[in-house]
Regions:
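Bacterial N-terminal signal peptides that target proteins for export
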Residues: 1-8
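Bacterial N-terminal signal peptides
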Residues: 8-16
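Sec/Tat signal peptide C-region and signal peptidase I cleavage site
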Residues: 18-22
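Mixed-charge, low-complexity intrinsically disordered regions
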Residues: 24-172, 187, 277-594, 607-610
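A recognition module on extended beta-rich or small alphabeta surfaces enriched in W/G with H and D/E
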Residues: 160-195, 237-282
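...with weaker cross-activation on analogous glycine-rich loops/strands in unrelated enzymes
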Residues: 172-228
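Catalytic Cys-His active-site segments of thiol-dependent hydrolases/isopeptidases
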Residues: 222-245
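Intrinsically disordered, low-complexity proline-rich regions
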Residues: 595-599
Length: 614
């Protein structure tokens, strides 16, 4: 390769770096094939899987730490933005990689994307760009819907050699793949043609790019923290097809224990964490690709195939703990953390102090967004609330509501707060299981000798740290109101997401307070043209302000229930269980708010579906 430049020395240096980049390819081309959907030049290897994991993890990092546009990016932006897609970097793509897919194919993919199709598209796209063999399976139900049947059977497969072009393969895969592809028993007909297999809970194999499947919902594992926490990428099923991060171990649930079915001990053992069944390109003596097949279960041992998840759940079900060396973790989540952590110890106080900085930052960013939204409403009028629409809801809408409302980002902020609660809860549990793992630096004055003492100390230190972290917001009359993290924690379920509301309500100013008295009346319009008074709309939105995840069904407003739904306990209450006995309660949302009389037109008593079946 020749480079023309006015600086010959730079050209030589660039050429050297260019060649070194290709030389650093973890899996250089060794195969030859120019037929089918795309050229195939590599086999899947352990190093290739690590390369894929790095690619997926980078997308997650950009979705959480990139610009505002990158954090809300849909699939077209993710794939075409060179900062988000490492495969747009020639050195990462490697020698013999395939070019970017067309914008028309990307539009087609976007239009059909859902949680399951995202888990299909990402490895398919990676295989295409890196010139790897790929295939998908077709499944059919034993009875009922393929997404919800007791189990499915594999009817056949389609490999890249079966398609005439890359666009054909992508489109066929987007049509044929659903969450039903995960519902294949290990011992069923053609089971060794399945797309995925259960994976070992082992840092060598449980990598970004693996999947998690729980009845009708699939996620892409995208990040494992130093402490062994699993973080995921998810895709909405609404028309906007948003891709968002899902930070929570609670999605790893619903796993069937081995032996649950006495007639077939492996029946139902398809939920949980799974690894892709990487295909093999069959080659002749000249290195030409002559076919593609699935790896067998035995061949997949190299990539982490294991049924241990179902054994673990069986032991936990029987004993309420599992023996892990000298330790006895009491939940599958704790076992995952113990096995997947990459640190020798944790320092709860140090973690809390650093995390409070991050938590404050996300609310400081929120303030700028609140002010921009208020300015938009003042200048261009009220924004219609997407009430009871088939194709839209408050989390996924079109136009101005999507741009200026904050229900989705507020879910993320609440989850960021509750992550701290969960992490500290984990630290208290670890103190009993392996006290040497929990370093008490900075907590010496508490003379900690028990889990109860540690939890009390962490609550005290959290309160101190939260009092020391503060920001401010501008009221509608431009007065400045200071808020500490203590204030934000107190108002956690009171922060309005409705862009029609003035900043006082957006920041949860208490009813009857001087802070709230300055809020001007601003109605919230609904699609039929009716305008809902501000205080009434605010109370009817109470349920949505309590959620820990986005909903996919229609959103209500008029006559929406305002109490009787469970609201998660905050950090102090969660840790208090270590030294107090508390009866479980159903918390009334927005208890400070007087509930208005229900609107006469309402018939709203609906079930809110939290997990889409795709």
């Amino acid at each position: 390769m020749k480079f023309k430049t006015a600086f010959p020395a730079l050209a030589v240096l660039f050429a050297v770096l260019f060649e070194q980049a290709y030389a650093a390819d973890p899996n250089p081309p060794t195969l030859h094939s120019n037929r089918g959907a795309w050229p195939i030049r590599r086999q899947w290897t352990g190093d290739e899987v690590l390369h894929y994991a790095k690619w997926v993890e980078h997308i997650y990092e950009m979705k959480t730490k990139g610009s505002v546009e990158q954090r809300i990016a849909k699939i077209q932006r993710i794939i075409t933005d060179p900062e988000m897609n490492l495969l747009e970097n020639p050195s990462f793509l490697g020698q013999g990689g395939n070019p970017q897919i067309s914008s028309s194919v990307l539009r087609t993919i976007h239009a059909s994307l859902d949680c399951a199709k995202l888990t299909c598209f990402l490895p398919t796209y990676y295989a295409y760009r890196r010139a790897l063999p790929w295939m998908i399976s077709y499944v059919y139900p034993t009875k009922g819907d393929v997404r919800t049947s007791d189990y499915n059977l594999v009817s056949g497969t389609m490999s890249t050699l079966d398609a005439g072009s890359a666009s054909d393969f992508f489109i066929q895969a987007s049509i044929g793949y659903s969450s039903g592809n995960y519902r294949v028993n290990l011992t069923g007909k053609n089971a060794q043609l399945s797309d995925t297999l259960p994976v070992a809970i082992n840092p060598k194999f449980l990598l970004p790019g693996c999947m998690n499947y729980t009845d009708g919902h699939s996620l892409v594992l995208a990040k494992i923290s130093d402490y062994g926490e699993l973080h995921f990428l998810n895709c909405s099923t609404t028309e906007t097809r948003d891709i968002f991060t899902y930070n929570g171990m609670n999605t790893v649930a619903g796993i069937t224990p081995r032996g649950y079915d006495e007639k077939d001990e492996w029946n139902g053992c398809f939920q949980g964490l799974r690894v892709l069944r990487f295909p093999i390109a069959l080659v002749n003596s000249a290195g030409d690709v002559v076919g593609i097949r699935r790896r067998t279960n035995k061949e997949m041992n190299e990539f982490g195939f294991s049924t241990e998840q179902y054994e673990i759940i069986r032991e936990l079900t029987a004993n309420q703990f599992i023996a892990e060396g000298t330790l006895k973790p009491q939940s599958f989540h704790d076992l995952i953390r113990l096995r997947m952590k990459s640190v020798d110890h944790i320092k709860p106080l140090e973690f809390m102090e650093a995390y409070a900085d991050e938590l404050l930052e996300v609310y400081q960013i929120r303030e700028q967004f609140v002010q921009d939204a208020w300015r938009e409403v003042l200048q261009n009028g009220p924004i219609v609330y997407p009430e009871e629409l088939r194709e839209e809801n408050i989390f996924q809408a079109k136009g101005r509501w999507e741009t200026w409302s904050s229900p989705s980002s507020d879910v993320d902020r609440r989850n960021k707060y509750f992550y701290l609660a969960d992490w500290l809860d984990y630290a208290v549990r670890c103190y009993e299981m392996m006290p040497q793992f929990v370093r008490l630096d900075g907590l010496e004055k508490y003379n900690i000798t028990s889990q109860a003492a540690l939890s009390r100390a962490l609550i005290d230190e959290k309160r101190r740290i939260f009092r020391a972290h503060s920001m401010s917001y501008k009221k509608s009359n431009r007065e400045t109101v200071p808020l500490t993290l203590v204030d934000i924690e107190e108002r956690l379920f009171d922060l309005s997401f409705d862009p029609n509301h003035p900043p006082e309500l957006r920041w949860g100013a208490p009813a009857g307070s001087a802070e709230r008295a300055s809020a001007p009346e601003r109605n919230t319009p609904v699609p039929n043209g009716e305008r809902i008074p501000m205080e009434q709309a605010y109370v009817w939105q109470s349920y949505y302000r309590s959620l820990g995840q986005r909903e996919t069904g229609m959103s209500a407003l008029r006559g929406m229930f305002t109490e009787g739904f469970p609201v998660r306990k905050k950090l102090d209450q969660q840790l208090a269980k270590w030294f107090l006995f508390e009866q479980p309660v159903v918390v009334t949302a927005s208890a400070k708010q007087p509930a208005p009389a229900p609107a006469p037109r309402s018939t709203s008593t609906r079930v809110h579906i939290l997990v889409p079946r795709t």
